[in-house]
Amino acid sequence: MAWRTLARYVQSLEDSGELIRVADPVDVELEAGCFADRLVKRGGGAILFEQPRLPDGSISDLPLAMNLFGTRDRTNHALGVKRPDEIGNRMVSLMKPDIGGIMKAPWTGIGLALEGMSMAPMKVRKGACQQIVIKDPDVTKLPIPKTWPEDGGRYITLPLVVTADPETGVHNMGMYRSQVFGPKELGLHWQAHKHGADHADASKDRMPVAICLGGPPEVMFSSISPLPDNLSEYEFAGLLGKRRLRITKCITNELMVPAGLLYTSDAADD
């Protein structure tokens, strides 16, 4: 199922009684993480903190959602399946179609053709993530949690990090835990064997990076999937959502990012 935006998925959780709203202020340092930890361990619902309190005592303008995919049922709901192996079966049918069956009954191949067409991303001029442009961004004002006492600081735990090969321009989207170092500085935890690290190593100068927040479920799951090199995360997101993923160009660099994001930070890797 193509959710298109995270807001649609969160609304579906609320409609089905799977979302807990917390209207009172909750600290992003440790307190919010404690709520989420207890919910995960007891198979509880997703939780939305409407007034996340930042370390300086102020209330963030943005809410904080946690435990969105914390149960098997919610994960299946996010992916639009009853069983996760449905996705694998669809992949197999695309890679090894029943040619004989299609020749005998050509109409049975229509669904397969539509499935394949859904994988090609669609470029659009503007996305939701560009409706408001902040000229002087400060990531410390975002409701980024510190979830464990011994953590080195506050971390974005579900960031969609987009990079490109400096020679071929081929994009990669990975989910790399990002530590807040300052108002305009994040530390990206990409291991040596990840494509993001490959792109950084191959770059002789500052490398453009897009750090994206609040993507729809099909994009989040695609970003963490171990895909072959000839299948992009954007194509796989289209397969998961059964609909072409809309992508748009960043404002300050040439990277293409999902258009339905809540927040995108155009950055550079040093």
How does the language model describe each region?
Residues D266-D270:
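A short, hydrophobic C-terminal helix/tail in secreted or cell-surface proteins
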Residues M1-S265:
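Extended, highly charged
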